[in-house]
Amino acid sequence: MRNTDKRRDILDLKIGKSVKYTAAAFSGAFMHLTFLVIFAIIQLYIMVIFNVFSVGLYIVLGLICKRENFERRAYNWVSAIYFEIALHSFLCTLFLGVNTCFFLYTMMTIPVMLYYLFLTCEKKMFKRGTFLFSLCSLALLSAALTFDHFCDPFFYTFRRPLTLNETDLMRTINIAFN
């Protein structure tokens, strides 16, 4: 068998939905574990606590996906994940400012969450989710960017401005994860 034939065989693998959802959930847990470490290093403890919750949410979701129960309550899980991501993005933008690029997650949530809704929910739920998630994303993004325009980030107010290396590290991680 030639090398190109082997590659084609790998690309033709059929991967079940539960494996895809499980991989996405554990990827989310890994991302938040990374954020947890970064926030612990810069001593932003409110976000450390938030990320402990986030890691737990994604691990529970990953375990549920393994049992293939995800699609029965897909709208609830997608909504929980959406609001976790949107709130995390909003709080990080308030605490750390737009230079760290956490606001990108607010924009990223719309296509990603709507894709999951499209795959798992009825048309009525999809339309409701589209409207709700888009409106919430617009409101949170507008509020965070307006706050950042007129005020210093909370972390700067209570602690210190981030160093250029800290800002670059967070920006790099956020762009890579988005």
Tell where the protein language model's regions lie, with residue ranges.
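Juxtamembrane helix-loop boundaries in multi-pass membrane proteins
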Residues: 12-24
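Alpha-helical transmembrane segments and their interfaces in multipass membrane proteins
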Residues: 33-53, 71, 96, 119-178
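Short, Lys/Arg-rich, polar N-terminal cytosolic tail immediately upstream
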Residues: 1-15
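Hydrophobic transmembrane alpha-helices and their membrane-interface boundaries in multi-pass
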Residues: 23-113, 137
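Membrane-interface helix-boundary motifs at transmembrane edges
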Residues: 11-15, 63-77, 118-130
